[in-house]
Amino acid sequence: MDEPVVEVETHIAAKPDKVWAAMTARKSPMFMGATMDTDWQPGSDYTLKGEWEGRGFTDYGKIETALAGRELSFTHWSKTPEPPESYNAVRYQIMPAGSGSKVTLTQFQRGKPQTFDDKTRAEFKKNWSMMLEALKKAAES
């Protein structure tokens, strides 16, 4: 069962289709300069390669849902290729909001139960908020 770990949201002055296009670009600013290799089809694997705080990384996962302009979800793992039961899940929901969009990102825990302290949850929230801010800037430009 998926357990929500953290949720963040932002309002973007762009229609959902423009938010979707910015979100699914191969070098989406949302991924902070990293490159996402996938075909965005449910069931497809992806790799996200880039640099964070001066260190290279490769993240892994599988696309779960890809409903253009509405919802994107995928599993996520940040260290080495691990079995899927170790992955987190991330869901972006895009809702029309006035002349723009509301985007809600939820990170879920899967697999082995883990307890996250307040400091860790705050770090997750900070990182996801930075990603949404980058998405906002890209979609609004």
PLM region spans:
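A conserved amphipathic terminal alpha-helix motif
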Residues: 109-141
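Hydrophobic ligand-binding cavity/cleft-lining segments
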Residues: 1-38
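Alpha-helical scaffold segments that form or flank carboxylate-/histidine-based iron centers
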Residues: 7, 47, 51, 119-123
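Hydrophobic pocket/interface hotspot
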Residues: 19, 23, 46-48, 63, ...
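Hydrophobic-ligand binding "helix-grip"
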Residues: 36-39, 54-102, 108-110
